Amino acid sequence: MPNVRLTLAYDGTAYHGFQKQSGSGLPTIQETLERCLAELSGAALKVTGASRTDAGVHARGQVVNFVTGRWGIPTERIPAALNGVLPGDIAALDAREVPADFHARYSAVAKTYSYTLYNHPVRSPFQRLYSLHVPRALDLRAMRLAARHLMGRHDFSTFQAAGRPVQSAVRTLTRADIEAQAPLVRLVFRADGFLYNMVRIMAGTLLEVGLERLDPEALPDIIASGDRARAGPTVPPHGLCLEEVEYDST
């Protein structure tokens, strides 16, 4: 039976995260997608996501996979068929058949996330669902200096929220960029994996640096400490976006 890899974009505002919450009645991306797939296929299909994005988090490049029988829709036509039944805040971008052992989460070799700040004295009603309003001017140079210290292979326990224990908190961060196009500032992170709330805590820490509440040269000691209390706050979810999930050969 074909294993299908599907790329999605979504506005996470109205959803309680990606993962289905059995019996809760709360809308999630997974539940909505599975319901629409069932409408097209006439069968219950289980979807596996590359990232279990939290409530309010958005995606430009979420990847899922699901195994399906022959249902009369060519794989390349699945996005068009799905977009006919999906709500307007979710879009199917691409579909392809992949090997049977492909797993959207465990086959991923890298993920890229962005966190957007709206750096202007007056808030924007048009950006409020997709960025964090920061009215004070930011020291972008200091933020870039701090971001360099995040690069490389580290134990990122300092930037891990409680609730999802892992065997190892060691990750390799290959990108930590501060992109500014006033009034927007985008923090972009690429790594071989991320801990729970790691991006939001790193963003909160860099924001503290930008607001001159934290010395950028303190980052190495903060990372080495493994102490969550020494990092910055966990910024709200609505500024976060899953940009891309990468795989070796699919």
Swiss-Prot record:
It is an enzyme of class 5 (isomerase). GO terms for biological process: tRNA pseudouridine synthesis. SUPFAM superfamilies: Pseudouridine synthase. Signal peptide: none annotated. It catalyses: uridine(38/39/40) in tRNA = pseudouridine(38/39/40) in tRNA. Keywords: Isomerase, tRNA processing. InterPro entries: PsdUridine_synth_cat_dom_sf (IPR020103), PsdUridine_synth_TruA (IPR001406), PsdUridine_synth_TruA_a/b_dom (IPR020097), PsdUridine_synth_TruA_C (IPR020095), TruA/RsuA/RluB/E/F_N (IPR020094). Homodimer. HAMAP family: TruA. This is tRNA pseudouridine synthase A. It comes from Desulforudis audaxviator (strain MP104C).
